[in-house]
A protein has these predicted regions:
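A short glycine-rich, Lys/Arg-flanked "PGG" loop and its adjoining helix->strand segment in the class I
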Residues: 121-135
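Conserved Class I S-adenosyl-L-methionine
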Residues: 180-181, 200-289
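Conserved alpha-helix/loop element of class I SAM-dependent methyltransferases that forms part
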Residues: 21-41
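Conserved catalytic/acceptor-binding region of the Class I
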Residues: 138-229
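A short acidic, Gly/Pro-enriched loop at the edge of an enzyme's catalytic core
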Residues: 96-107
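A short SAM/SAH-binding and catalytic strip from SAM-dependent methyltransferases
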Residues: 107-120
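Class I SAM-dependent methyltransferase SAM/SAH-binding core
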Residues: 46, 52-97
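N-terminal, positively charged/glycine-rich alpha-helical extensions of SAM-dependent methyltransferases
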Residues: 1-14
């Protein structure tokens, strides 16, 4: 059972909640314009590195006629995804050795996976399993904007804790996180180099601002709670990865401080006290054909 990523890098709630926001229906038309998929045709689509299944779930909603298979090497992600979405086939597997025959799929898609996998294997396996004329879609996060609410600033205790953790945390190197980063120019170049043609690029802007009047109260609260999940998952990762750097008492105090901050932010929202905190993600979409 492989649970390295969910235990040491990004927790289930962090990935699922943040991706559900990133692929919310408010941004659907931006994505669809770049994907250029025919929703009236019964396509076979493979998502590589699906995590806890948020993107596969959304794709099933956007393209109900498409038969979707989603694969990840983390057992906990796959188990969670299966419990959330029954219209998708979720499997454990390796992006560098896809368990499918040649020419099996019409579309492959991945989200924030390319930077973690050796490029010749990442693109080579997709080229192999795609049918002639099949489409490869690679989504990659680019530099965005993150302005937190003032009440979410770290206290001196939190700052000291995270500084201590940073001195000893080698999980990025140990687990090959972002081992193969590529710039906005290098990513489409790599897709061409490994056999794809008609390569195109585009960008989706995901604006998450809870106090924006256009944002529903439900969505605003979801945005705030997703940030809370991210911080709590980061704390859990410390316990899993370098437990000697966080005593039970320290971790309990950190949880109290984190929850108190987010409870205050929720109270501010409920009272109509606008903070104008925002998170703007820029998602690069690269599309190529076999």
């Amino acid at each position: 059972m492989n649970v390295i990523w969910s235990s040491h890098v990004q927790g289930i709630r962090t990935l699922y909640d943040s991706r559900k926001l990133r692929f919310d229906d408010r941004f659907a038309e931006q994505y669809k314009a770049l994907f250029q998929l025919d929703g009236n045709v019964s396509l076979k689509l493979l998502e590589i590195g699906c995590g806890p299944g948020a993107l596969a779930e959304v794709l099933h909603h956007w393209y109900p006629k498409t038969r979707i298979t989603a694969l990840d090497r983390d057992s906990a992600f796959v188990q969670f995804a299966k419990s959330k979405e029954h219209g998708v086939t979720f499997l454990e597997g390796d992006a560098t050795a896809l368990p499918f025959g040649n020419n099996s799929f019409d579309v492959t898609v991945s989200n924030t996976v390319s930077e973690h996998v050796e490029p010749s294997k990442f693109f080579g396996e997709q080229l192999r399993v795609l049918k002639p004329g099949g489409v490869c879609l690679v989504l990659s996060s680019r530099k965005g904007i993150h302005i937190p609410a003032k009440c979410l600033a770290d206290s001196e205790y939190e700052q000291a804790f995270w500084e201590k953790v940073a001195r000893f945390d080698d999980s990025m190197e140990k687990y090959g996180v972002c081992k193969y980063p590529m710039s906005e120019a290098q990513l489409p170049e790599a897709m061409e180099r490994y056999g794809f043609h008609d390569v195109q690029t585009g960008y989706v802007t995901v604006d998450l601002t809870p106090d924006d009047p256009k944002v529903s109260p439900h969505m605003a609260l979801t945005m705030i709670e997703a940030q809370r999940s991210n911080d709590l998952d980061a704390l859990a990762s410390v316990k899993n990865t370098i437990p000697e750097q966080g005593t039970d008492a320290e971790l309990a105090q950190m949880r109290r401080l984190i929850n108190a901050k987010y409870d205050l932010r929720l109270a501010q929202y409920a009272r109509g006290e606008k903070q104008w905190d925002t998170s703007v993600s820029v998602i690069m979409a690269v599309r190529g054909k076999k």
